[in-house]
Amino acid sequence: MEFIGRERELARIKKTLKAPEQRNVLIYGRRRVGKSELIKQALTDLSDVATVYYECRQTSEADNLESLSVLVAEALSFPPLAFAGIRELIEFLFVQAKDKNITLVLDEYPYLRDAVKGLDSILQTSIDAHREDSRLNIVLCGSYVEIMKSLIEHESPLYGRIDLALELKPMDYFDAAKFYPAFSPEDKVQLYSVFGGIPFYNRLIDQSQSVRDNIIELVTEPGARLESEVPSYLNAEISKMTNANEVFGALAQGYSRWGDVLAQSHVSSGPAMADVLDKLISLEIVQKRAPINDPTNKRKSGYFVVDPLSLFYYRYVFRNASARQLLDPEVFYDRHVSQDFEENYVPHMFEEICRQYLVRQNRTGKIEPAFDAIGKYWYDDPANKTSGEFDVVTQDPEGYAFYEAKFRKSPITQKMVDEEIAQVEATGLKCHRYGFFSRSGFEAGESDRTVFIDLPQMFG
């Protein structure tokens, strides 16, 4: 299976593990984001290293110890080994690594941490004792982000002992598209709008089928491969799913302000909704976003679902659960998904893709001057008694740059460009650059203050 993307993360892990001294690595991120495959890929390039890769279980210490002992014996070419406990096994590996390179990977570390009392302290004691005389590298990996983050906090026994802490995020649109290169740029936008940047989801996409057929077979038809992916993930993380479903339902329909979400979701109280939103934010499924020109104004802040599959699921599958069970899968898609997906959902997601494009260009030094902030811009227009927000605006040392994203079947014309700029300037926002993203190209000419970006550029 070809390994795709993650070049920067892979390079950082390899550099750390190839160091001559004892090293400890922490890798964490949401489920399905590709942590295990990333670690395995990094290990393939390590020569003369004995590797013990153990996927921890939600069982007892004794059960984990027995399984891990077998792997240790195999990796070191020893006869069957027996240890009194995990502490003794860890100490054994540190001693063995005094004259050889050994890497121990504990995948889903929180499971073993639950089973072994004081495991963080056990590791701390052995690391401190052998930091200078052992070449045992330890990689701790886990999907429970809050637990994994706590390992590098000041109160943790492992504080100051982790040489590389890497939070693995979903891929952006550009890297995600490498999983389905045969599709057109338009199709790639639609696929990312559903499957996002999770490698596990993207590997399931069949390039011999249409976007529509992939969505039906993987998400919307009863029994689809990813039918229960969103609810099962949330059920494992959230205790009160009724409230979560209500909040998701409101967010998926486009409500983002606190008061609007509370009213539309029918959650019993503000504190109850705050608990749900805080949890969803910690899971990085929802983000709280404030205007870049008024970042402390709570009234102008909004909540947005940033995980595409969760957004798609709650907008179409969860909302239409009864009809989905009654209709043929293709009829269901055509009746309850197709039109809104093309006219509203994908154009909305295209704005996020455009933001990702700008961030990618900015990080690689292709935007001058580089911007320090990107987000929505809130405006008040007293003359016309209106207020609102522009969706994609960046801020740099020279001021603001405005970007408009159009995912439509006709080109952006010069008239549209002029009208958009006039509308922006009428609000009092002065920009040194106006950028336009277009699905279907342009029938307009660039000037010294405009920049045009089409899909081939974005995926090139």
Segment roles from a protein language model:
Residues S301-G460:
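A cross-kingdom feature that marks ATP-driven nucleic-acid transaction machinery
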Residues M1-R335:
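Phosphate-binding site recognition
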